[in-house]
Amino acid sequence: YSLKNKKLKTFNTKKTKVRFDIPAVKGKGFKVRVRSYVKINNKKCYGRWSDYKVVIPQAKISIQRTDETTVTVRWNKVTNAKRYYIYACNDIKAAKPLWKKVAVVGSNTGKYEYNNCIVGRSTAIYVIPEVKVGKSLYKAAYVWYLYMDIK
């Protein structure tokens, strides 16, 4: 389903994981629900539907170094995002990298300058959009980040 409750696609599978590509939800997010069934005497007996799970895409980013300790992160806007949370780590190659929320910016913003990079370390960044669906706010799940060696 789209975030506006329009049915987009139905999948039948015997697998526990399904990967799919629906261009209509690219950069927008979607809702998903599942139910199982068993065959008894060649007749399908269905279980109850799960609750809807709202899936918001993580913002696709690029980073560019602008001076010795500064990088600019740019991202593609996510439809209906109300704000973006920017997270950074100044030593991604450490045994236990420490991520910090460095900024929260509005929906009209598509870039941010991070100026706390440490020379000799690898700075990593990711951006999480927050989208309003109905009366609720949803954030994208953290899936990936980009990093740059600061030399």
PLM ranges: what are they?
Residues Y1-K26, Y85-V119, K132-G134:
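Recognizes extended acidic, P/S/T-rich segments that occur
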Residues T13, K39, R65-T66, S107, ...:
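Generic beta-strand structural signal
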Residues N12, E68, T72-R74, K111, ...:
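Serine/threonine-rich, low-complexity intrinsically disordered segments
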